[in-house]
Amino acid sequence: MSAEIVLAVDGGNSKTDLALVGADGSLLALARGAQSSPHHLGVDGCLLVLERLLDEAVAEAGLARRNGRVAQVAKLMLAGVDFPAEEVALAERVRAEGWAAETSVANDTFAVLRAGTERGWGVAVVCGAGINCVGVAPDGRHARFPALGAITGDWGGGYDVGLAALSSAARSEDGRGPRTTLEGAVPHHFGLRTPTELAEAIHRRRIDVRRVVELAPLVFSEAEDDAVASEIVARLAAEIVALARAALIRLDLHQGPVEVLLGDRKSTRLNSSHRLRSRMPSSA
């Protein structure tokens, strides 16, 4: 049975999808769980999440595991696997688990590129909890970014957008910045009245600061009528374009037509508002 099955994983910083797929493309089982980024959970924590999801998928598909093996091929696309050495190390651990006869590991940005184009090349930008980009040329050359946050020049993931909203709300309240509807909307999201109350709750660890990622959709909603929220969205658009443009130039793909793919709802909403299309190179 394993010779006919592909184990596919799309693991992000907020959720993980694990699928068992037949050789004909039929979906045998799909399990969804928590984040599986080895950067945040460690390799052991990552494997624990995947093992649980695999057990669910195997049960759903009505399969039997023989010596741990489920599939002929395992393709794992995971956030937090940002360097080739990390891909190699995680792939070795997965092979040791014996889930499949053949195993490959890559960053989850490659999943967007593979899902969005049949050509197998182009540029993909993912804007989830963090932000990342990958470019692949027709000859197989890659353009990648470390995507480690501020230390590698990144801005624009859900955490950054949420933190910008929180900061703007606080500055609106105390007069240092322009007035914005975020002043009320941001604390209200957490059941509080003012940005100061929210800041104190975060400071005293009653609210985990990582929850600011929840504010990203709110920023888009407020941006329809609020100048400050709109500026945050515009900055995100500029960062996405900067990533895509850099990948295109590094691969010398800026002369002819190239598919540029956007992953996650935030970047998709940006594209639908034409903020991105007007800023992209003419080749994109």
Describe the function of each predicted region.
Residues M1-R66, V70-A71, R95, A115-W121, ...:
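ATP-binding/phosphotransfer module of carbohydrate and carboxylate kinases, centering on a glycine-rich
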Residues R275-R279:
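Basic polycationic patches enriched in arginine
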Residues K75-V81, C127-A129, V258-S267:
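Glycine-rich beta-strand-to-loop/alpha-helix junction loops that act as flexible
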Residues R69-M77, N107-V112:
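Short, glycine/charge-rich beta-strand/loop segments that flank catalytic centers
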Residues V73, E102-S104, E259:
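Proline-centered loop/turn at the N-terminus of a beta-strand
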Residues V81-R179:
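Phosphate-binding/catalytic loop of phosphoryl-transfer enzymes
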Residues G45-V49, G80-A85:
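Alpha-helical substrate-recognition element adjacent to the catalytic core
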Residues G22, L78-D82, T109, H274:
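Short glycine-rich, polar/acidic loop-and-turn segments at beta strand-coil junctions
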